[in-house]
Amino acid sequence: MIREERLLKVLRAPHISEKATMSAEKSNTIVFKVAKDATKKEIKAAVEKLFEVEVKSVNTLIIKGKTKRQGLRQGRRSDVKKAYVTLNEGQDLDFVGGAE
């Protein structure tokens, strides 16, 4: 069993983009930014516990940080790990829905 403190640190934020929105509408998939060391099992447990939904599958990927320049200084943005969480049929999770 994964500790509750760890589950709270696994999910960083929902990733909201045009692709993520189309994915949510088309295949019931939600996209999250997650901790770099998070496993698929931890991500699944965190989503199921925090949002009380059933998760069908979890796919992860790491986006490499871009190299950026400002004048003569050169730096690099941090790498980011994203998780595509597919929910079971009939499950719904809405982050961008309008407030009433």
From Swiss-Prot:
A GO cellular component annotation in the UniProt record: ribosome
Alphabetical list of PROSITE patterns matching this protein: RIBOSOMAL_L23 (PS00050)
GO MF term list: rRNA binding; structural constituent of ribosome
Keyword Protein biosynthesis attached: no
UniProt xrefs under InterPro entries: Nucleotide-bd_a/b_plait_sf, Ribosomal_uL23-like, Ribosomal_uL23/eL15/eS24_sf, Ribosomal_uL23_CS
Pfam families in UniProt: Ribosomal_L23
Keyword Oxidoreductase: no
Keywords: Ribonucleoprotein, Ribosomal protein, RNA-binding, rRNA-binding
Role noted for this protein: One of the early assembly proteins it binds 23S rRNA. One of the proteins that surrounds the polypeptide exit tunnel on the outside of the ribosome. Forms the main docking site for trigger factor binding to the ribosome.
PANTHER family given in the database record: 60S RIBOSOMAL PROTEIN L23A
Subunit organization: Part of the 50S ribosomal subunit. Contacts protein L29, and trigger factor when it is bound to the ribosome.
Entry's family note: Belongs to the universal ribosomal protein uL23 family.
Protein name: Large ribosomal subunit protein uL23
Species assigned in the record: Vibrio cholerae serotype O1 (strain ATCC 39541 / Classical Ogawa 395 / O395)
